[in-house]
């Protein structure tokens, strides 16, 4: 063990990101051959990654990369928020989303096969990161959108939104994306709300209106009014703009000669059982504060 120099240990540590004692142990077992030691550590890292794959990873970050009329959103999960805030984890997420964009990846499989700036695939980088930090890391979701005008907004790494517009500019699209992060609309316009959702709301409103004891024609008008209000509340265009509640989002974009085509929103851990945190309320408070 005394034949292994500190310089060699340092070099292996820089290459693998592993701990000093782990690097020294690998070099001893490889009789000082740094290439062999690095390869054995990669194999060991693969084994560690396989063992950790079943552990729940519900924390993490949302990363967005938009360029050349195309945007990619990635959700990358870790087991703890502590790791999600680690610079090494963040760097991996940034590398992954850029690689996905460059490869025009549309599926998780295509994202994992994409080459990063170091020449390794996202999957290889993921497994190396697992070996280094000791947590299950998963590339869970990828969403893409193409449009003439794109605006991205990320809140604390936990909510990522891309707004796609026809016309307008990036600043307007980013404002729309920020609004989506804060208010979380269901759809762009009221006519996109699924019929079964509208029917369910109408059923509830009808039952409530009948309890008022008012005449049938009045009840019908009440129901129509409640449905219209509901559609405005859940549709982006009908909502009060979060930065200026005196105007609707529809007027905001129309006045600038633009049209909202679509939006994509990802929340970290969405659909995974985890501690609930009201990030939308946090966005709202920061915008108003």
From Swiss-Prot:
Any Pfam family matching the protein: EF_TS
Stored InterPro entries: EF-Ts_dimer_sf (IPR036402), Transl_elong_EFTs/EF1B (IPR001816), Transl_elong_EFTs/EF1B_dimer (IPR014039), Transl_elong_Ts_CS (IPR018101), UBA-like_sf (IPR009060)
CDD domains per the UniProt record, alphabetical: UBA_EF-Ts
Major place of residence: cytoplasm
Region annotation (Involved in Mg(2+) ion dislocation from EF-Tu) ranges: 80-83
PROSITE patterns cross-referenced by the UniProt entry: EF_TS_1, EF_TS_2
Cellular component annotations (GO), alphabetically ordered: cytoplasm
Top-level taxonomic group: Bacteria
Keywords assigned by UniProt, alphabetized: Cytoplasm, Elongation factor, Protein biosynthesis
Subcellular location: Cytoplasm
Molecular functions per Gene Ontology: translation elongation factor activity
Keyword Cytoplasm attached: yes
Chain's role: Associates with the EF-Tu.GDP complex and induces the exchange of GDP to GTP. It remains bound to the aminoacyl-tRNA.EF-Tu.GTP complex up to the GTP hydrolysis stage on the ribosome.
Family: Belongs to the EF-Ts family.
Stated name of the protein: Elongation factor Ts
Organism of provenance: Francisella philomiragia subsp. philomiragia (strain ATCC 25017 / CCUG 19701 / FSC 153 / O#319-036)
């Amino acid at each position: 063990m005394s034949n292994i120099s500190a310089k060699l240990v340092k070099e292996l540590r820089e290459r693998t990101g592993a701990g000093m004692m782990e690097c020294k142990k690998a070099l001893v077992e490889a009789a000082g051959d740094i290439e062999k030691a690095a390869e054995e550590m990669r194999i060991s890292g693969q084994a560690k990654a396989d063992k950790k794959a079943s552990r729940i990873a519900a924390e993490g970050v949302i990363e967005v990369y938009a360029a050349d009329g195309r945007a990619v959103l990635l959700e990358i999960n870790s087991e703890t928020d502590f790791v999600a805030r680690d610079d090494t984890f963040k760097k991996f997420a940034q590398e992954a989303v850029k690689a996905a964009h460059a490869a025009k990846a549309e599926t998780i499989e295509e994202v994992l096969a994409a080459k990063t700036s170091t020449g390794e695939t996202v999957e290889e980088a993921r497994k190396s990161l697992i070996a280094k930090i000791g947590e299950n890391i998963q590339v869970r979701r990828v969403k893409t959108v193409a449009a003439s005008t794109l605006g991205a907004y990320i809140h604390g790494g936990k909510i990522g939104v891309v707004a796609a517009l026809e016309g307008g500019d990036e600043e307007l699209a980013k404002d729309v994306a920020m609004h989506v992060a804060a208010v979380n609309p269901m759809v762009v316009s009221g006519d996109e709300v699924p019929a079964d959702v509208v029917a369910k709301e109408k059923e509830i409103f009808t039952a409530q209106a009948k309890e008022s004891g008012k005449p049938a024609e009045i009840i019908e008008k009440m129901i129509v009014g409640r449905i219209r209000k509901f559609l405005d509340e859940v549709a982006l265009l009908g909502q009060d703009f979060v930065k200026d509640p005196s105007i609707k989002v529809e007027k905001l974009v129309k006045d600038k000669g633009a049209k909202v085509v679509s939006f994509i929103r990802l929340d970290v851990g969405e659909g995974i059982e985890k501690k609930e945190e009201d990030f939308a309320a946090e966005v709202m408070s920061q915008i108003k504060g």
